[in-house]
Amino acid sequence: MGNMGIWQLLIIAVIVILLFGTKKLRSLGGDLGGAVKGFKNAMSSEEEKKALEETASEKATPSVEKTAPNAEKKTETKDKEQV
């Protein structure tokens, strides 16, 4: 009952074509394709935005790491001056 063969699918396709016509189905397919394309573009732009944010955060993090060793050197020189 749940298994549809090729003949059942062909009969359903013929009925759909007779009900809606080829022009309507063609325009429906074009609309569906445009929606899928828009969705893909939105997803790719979202991924690019995340990648840019990650790159920006990675660039900000090393500058903090560079300042930390300088702070350690200053404390070492203060310790030497006190001795």
Swiss-Prot record:
Arranged from A to Z, the UniProt key words for this protein are:
Cell inner membrane, Cell membrane, Membrane, Protein transport, Translocation, Transmembrane, Transmembrane helix, Transport
Tell me where it resides.
Cell inner membrane
**What GO terms describe the biological role, i.e. biological process, of this protein?**
protein transport by the Tat complex
Name one molecular function that GO assigns to this entry: protein transmembrane transporter activity
Q: Which residues cross the membrane?
A: 1-21
Main function: Part of the twin-arginine translocation (Tat) system that transports large folded proteins containing a characteristic twin-arginine motif in their signal peptide across membranes. TatA could form the protein-conducting channel of the Tat system.
Complexes and interactors:
The Tat system comprises two distinct complexes: a TatABC complex, containing multiple copies of TatA, TatB and TatC subunits, and a separate TatA complex, containing only TatA subunits. Substrates initially bind to the TatABC complex, which probably triggers association of the separate TatA complex to form the active translocon.
The name of this protein is: Sec-independent protein translocase protein TatA
Please report the organism this UniProt entry assigns to the protein. Answer: Shewanella woodyi (strain ATCC 51908 / MS32)
The taxonomic lineage of its organism, from the top, reads:
Bacteria, Pseudomonadati, Pseudomonadota, Gammaproteobacteria, Alteromonadales
